[in-house]
């Protein structure tokens, strides 16, 4: 089992200026800092005794057989990226703050999941690569 945690963040100004529709025309800037509240991701291989291949627990629970049936977009895309089409995997998300808090929870969850899932593959990525992959997934794949 792999457990990772990623901090939430507070943006002081510039919200929305990190979207391509804005910064390609107007430039963008965000000043942000992490806080001492975290998102946690646990990832483990499931024994092959279940009728599903993927169990995902966040504010919903998913039990699905095929990766393309996963409703949680970032987790689906991360599993595809690391080629987890044949393994039985469980991803469990928990956090110190509720969803929709406005403190970057979805980005924290994506970054944390990339870190944990890459570690399961023994393909640890540096912080810059994790950040670029998270941006690609959130802005281009979804």
Protein language model regions, located:
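Active-site signature of alpha/beta-hydrolase-fold catalytic machinery across serine-
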Residues: 112
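Short, conserved phosphate/pyrophosphate- and ester-handling motifs at nucleotide-, phospho-/glycolipid
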Residues: 106
